[in-house]
Amino acid sequence: MKTFAETAKAYLALTKPRVIELLLVATIPAMLQAARGEVNFGLILLTLIGGWMGAGAANTFNNVVDHDIDQLMRRTRRRPTARQTVSVGEARVFAWVLLIASVLWLGFLCHSWLAAGFIVLTNWFYVFVYTKWLKRRTWQNVIWGGAAGCMPVIVGWAVITDNNGGAFHAGWSSWLQAIILFMIIFFWTPPHTWALGMRYREDYEAAGVPMMPVVKPPLQVTRQILAYTWAAVITSLLLVPAASWIYLAAALISGGWFIIKAHMLHQGVKNGTPVKPMQLFFLSNNYLSILFVALSVDAVLGWQTLAHAVLG
C-alpha cells in the first residue's frame, strides 16, 4: 500500500513539473512587459498558480492518452500511468479537477475570464489536436502541436489587460507584443524538441511516434533545426522597439549563441562526425531563459524603449 507521500509524488509527476517550470518562466515576462514599469506581485503569483493548474491538467490528460506508448519508451516508461502507480481513470479525474480549478481561479481570483478561456482552449488543442491526432500521425506534430506550449504568454498578457481596462482597451499594438512572444516560443519549440528526438530516436521509433528524426534523414532534420533557430532569433528582435538596450543585448548575445550551436550540430551531421544533440537541447533552454529574464528585468526597470529613444 502506498504512503500519502508516495501517492502525492505520483500525482505531482502526472503534471510534469519540469515542463511546467519552463512554461511558467514564459508567463512572468509577458505579464511584466504588458504592465511595463508597474509590478503587481500578487496578481503575478495568482496567475502562476492558476497557470500551473491549467498546464498540469493538460499534461495529466497527456499522460492519460499516451499511457500506452509511454510504456514502450525508456524516457517515459516510469511515468505514473505507464507504471500504473496511478490508474488511467484516477488520472483523468485529477486532470478534470485541475482544469476546472484553473478556470475558476483565473476567472474569480485573477479577474480574467479571457485567460480562463485560453486555458480551456489550450487543453482542448493539446489533448485532442496534438496528443490524439498530430503526435501519432505526422512528423509535423511538434510544429503545430507546439502552439499549446506558447499559450502561457497569452494567458499572462490576458490577465494584465483584463485588469487594466480589458482586452479591447489595450489595443492592437499591445497584443502585437504578445503575438511576438508567442511566435518566439513557436519557432523555438521545433529545434528544442527535435534535438531531443535525435537523442531518443530509437525510443520514438519503437513507440511508433513519427517524430521528424525518426522519419527523415539526419541532415534534413538539422537543416530544419537551423531554419527554425534562425526564425526564433529573428522573431525575438521584433520586440526590440518595445524594450530597452538590456533586452537587445540579451537577444543578440543569447541568440547568436543559439545559432552557432545549431550550425555546429548541422555541420557535424553534414561532415559525418559524431554529434551531441542534447547540447543544443540544453542550450535552447538556456537561450529562452536568458531572453525572458532579460525582458523581465527590462520591463521592471521600465527604462525608455528603443522606439521612443529613436523616434522621440
Curated annotation (Swiss-Prot):
<keyword id="KW-0350">Heme biosynthesis</keyword>
<dbReference type="InterPro" id="IPR006369">
    <property type="entry name" value="Protohaem_IX_farnesylTrfase"/>
</dbReference>
<keyword id="KW-0472">Membrane</keyword>
<feature type="transmembrane region" description="Helical">
    <location>
        <begin position="168"/>
        <end position="188"/>
    </location>
</feature>
<feature type="transmembrane region" description="Helical">
    <location>
        <begin position="41"/>
        <end position="61"/>
    </location>
</feature>
<protein>
    <recommendedName>
        <fullName>Protoheme IX farnesyltransferase</fullName>
        <ecNumber>2.5.1.141</ecNumber>
    </recommendedName>
</protein>
<comment type="function">
    <text>Converts heme B (protoheme IX) to heme O by substitution of the vinyl group on carbon 2 of heme B porphyrin ring with a hydroxyethyl farnesyl side group.</text>
</comment>
<dbReference type="InterPro" id="IPR044878">
    <property type="entry name" value="UbiA_sf"/>
</dbReference>
<comment type="similarity">
    <text>Belongs to the UbiA prenyltransferase family. Protoheme IX farnesyltransferase subfamily.</text>
</comment>
<feature type="transmembrane region" description="Helical">
    <location>
        <begin position="114"/>
        <end position="134"/>
    </location>
</feature>
<dbReference type="InterPro" id="IPR000537">
    <property type="entry name" value="UbiA_prenyltransferase"/>
</dbReference>
<comment type="pathway">
    <text>Porphyrin-containing compound metabolism; heme O biosynthesis; heme O from protoheme: step 1/1.</text>
</comment>
<dbReference type="Pfam" id="PF01040">
    <property type="entry name" value="UbiA"/>
</dbReference>
<dbReference type="GO" id="GO:0008495">
    <property type="term" value="F:protoheme IX farnesyltransferase activity"/>
</dbReference>
<feature type="transmembrane region" description="Helical">
    <location>
        <begin position="12"/>
        <end position="32"/>
    </location>
</feature>
<feature type="transmembrane region" description="Helical">
    <location>
        <begin position="240"/>
        <end position="260"/>
    </location>
</feature>
<keyword id="KW-0812">Transmembrane</keyword>
<dbReference type="GO" id="GO:0005886">
    <property type="term" value="C:plasma membrane"/>
</dbReference>
<feature type="transmembrane region" description="Helical">
    <location>
        <begin position="141"/>
        <end position="161"/>
    </location>
</feature>
<dbReference type="GO" id="GO:0048034">
    <property type="term" value="P:heme O biosynthetic process"/>
</dbReference>
<feature type="transmembrane region" description="Helical">
    <location>
        <begin position="93"/>
        <end position="113"/>
    </location>
</feature>
<keyword id="KW-1133">Transmembrane helix</keyword>
<keyword id="KW-1003">Cell membrane</keyword>
<feature type="transmembrane region" description="Helical">
    <location>
        <begin position="290"/>
        <end position="310"/>
    </location>
</feature>
<keyword id="KW-0808">Transferase</keyword>
